[in-house]
Amino acid sequence: MILASLARYYSRLAAENDEMGNPKVPPYGFSEEKIGWILVLDKEGRLKTAVPNLTADKKPQPKLMSVPRPEKRTSGIKPNFLWDKTAYALGVEANKNKAEAKENPFTSSEKTFDAFKQYHLDLLQNSDDEGLQALCRFLKNWQPAHFATENLPAEMLDANIAFSLEKPTALIHKREAAQSLWAGCLKSDEALEGCA
């Protein structure tokens, strides 16, 4: 009885919007996460620009964004769907060695990038959505060393990033095909866990 009441309450909140026009709670399978940067890709998967997604405060902070819920990472490598921190999405993280950091601000994290890349290529390869295909092309061509050659800002290191298509401007994880694919992933996860 309590669970049914909580489910009804959640449904009511999900149907209501806050003062910014966003749902009061994220839809099932989504979570509000701090996303600091948005990488804008063209249809060919080329990186066009990196747009900061930060608050206008004195000390800017990443803004909250509704994204597919994050994986639980107690141990092992588990990429998130269509967003992640730079170690996964770009294969680079901040250099922890302070003495070297001035000259080499980032280090390569190829294992996490390879997992992110393979996870997405496996999931997205059969989609005909231009946003999902742009991300596939980006991941096929991206190398962690490109972080320096693309002149991406060091402030981006270790931040969560999401992807957007250049024209029409749209966050890739909010595209209809991405939402359908994510819903299918959630159903298969529930079936594996015996929740279906």
What are these regions (language model features)?
Residues M1-A196:
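Conserved phosphate-interacting/catalytic interface
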